[in-house]
Structures are given as C-alpha cells and as structure tokens.
Amino acid sequence: LRTKTTEMYTWSRAANGTTTHKHGIEYGLDFGEIKPLHTSLNISGAWFHIKRKNENMPLNYINSSFDYVGVLPSGGGNLRDRFNSTFRLITHIPAIKMVFTTSVQVVWYESTQTIYEDENGNSRYYLKSYEDKDYLVVDPVGYYDKQGRYTAWSPADADDADKSRIMYRTQPYLYEKDVIKPWALLSFRFTKEIGRVAELSVIANNFTNTKKWHTNPHSLAKTQLYPDMYFGAELKLKL
C-alpha cells in the first residue's frame, strides 16, 4: 500500500526590502594651537537617529510536515540612537619632526530597540497568553496550506490549535529599549617625519587594553563595547 505525503519547503533569494531613515547632526570645533605646548585641540562628533524597517512580508515556517506556512506583515526592524564626541590632542614638535596624536572617543548615549510597526508607525504586536505564558504576538496576514492555497488570516484562526502556531510570538522583553551607559576609548598615534620623503606612524588603539561588556537588562545578552587592543604601523611616501 502506497501512501502519498506532501511536504512544504521554503526558499529565499536576495532582495532589497529594507528601508533606512537616518538623520542627525555632525559638529566640529577647532580651538587652535596652544603655542607654548605646540599642541592643538579639536573636538568632533555626531548625534544620529536611525530607523530600519523590513518592507517584505516574511514567512513563519514551522517545519516541512506542518500543514501551514504563515505570511507575516511587513514592518519588523529596529531603532538606534547615538551621541558621541572625539577629543583630539595633536602635539607637533618641529625640532625633532615628530607628531603625537592622542584621541579620546566618548559615547555619551547609545540605545537600540526592536520594533514591529505598520505604515503609520503603530506597533503591530499585542500581549496574548499561550500555554499559560504571556507573549507579544503579531498576527499573520494570511497562510498557505499544502495545496499551495492562500487564505487571509481571520481573528478566529487565533483559537485554532494548529493555525495559532504560525502567529509570531516573542518574549515581552524583546521590544524594550536597551540603553548603554557612557564609555570612552583611548587611542594614540605617533608620527615621525623622515626628511621630506616619508612619514612613519605607529598606531595604538585601546592601548590601555580596557575590557568592558554591556549586559542588556531585559534579555541579559552581552555585547563587547571596546575593540580588542591592537598596534599597527603605517609608512607614507611623499612623491
């Protein structure tokens, strides 16, 4: 006796489906040279706000044997805000043809937040209990069955044991804003002028080897703030 089994699989292709809206302010201040010290001070930085949203409608695929594949609405994305300054001290000693540059980058404020919005900026998710647990849920706009038929989503589908599984569920903390406390990075650059033909530079980023991690208070995920300490050299020829 032969039996026929129908399974569903998904495939994907690259597509430009993300929109990005970015605005902010860049600034720069030059305080000139402190002549007795042969040192100048520059301050630069920026504030920006970035909003990214996926305009495609992703699929909520359970597995190959499940009866339905959900089609989720567009609008998933994230927000990012950042305000930073860089203080740069440049000391030029002409007598020995050396330039010392010390940079301190300070991130005063940084935050990230996951969003799922409609075209008017309203959140698509809502709180719903499932198996005695609370989740933030996004309803599909429709679903496909194993015969390839598409059906628009109905509120009554949320009470169906199988169809309710293609609703997009996340832990309530997912959409909470994560704010990072201020932090600073110290870097150094030494440049030696070799006559009129070349300059040799030695670079040290995070040479204090500062290690600091940020823990998201909602998800408890950890992110490394400081890059690893590294040293480099650069040779510049003047032709």
Predicted regions and their residues:
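Gram-negative outer-membrane beta-barrel transporters
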Residues: 7-121
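Extracytoplasmic loops and strand-loop junctions of Gram-negative outer membrane beta-barrel proteins
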Residues: 7-14, 66-73, 168-174, 182-184, ...
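C-terminal beta-signal and adjacent terminal beta-strands/loops
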Residues: 108-171, 181, 191-239
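Residue-level "hotspot" positions that anchor or transmit function at local structural transition points
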Residues: 17-19, 77, 178, 182, ...
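Outer-membrane beta-barrel architecture
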Residues: 26-30, 86-90, 189-191, 203, ...
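Short acidic-hydrophobic sequence patches enriched in Asp/Glu that either
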Residues: 81, 188, 227
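Outer-membrane beta-barrel proteins, especially TonB-dependent receptors
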Residues: 1-16, 24-28, 144, 170, ...
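Exposed loop/turn and edge beta-strand positions of beta-sandwich/beta-sheet ligand-binding modules
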Residues: 23, 83, 184, 198, ...
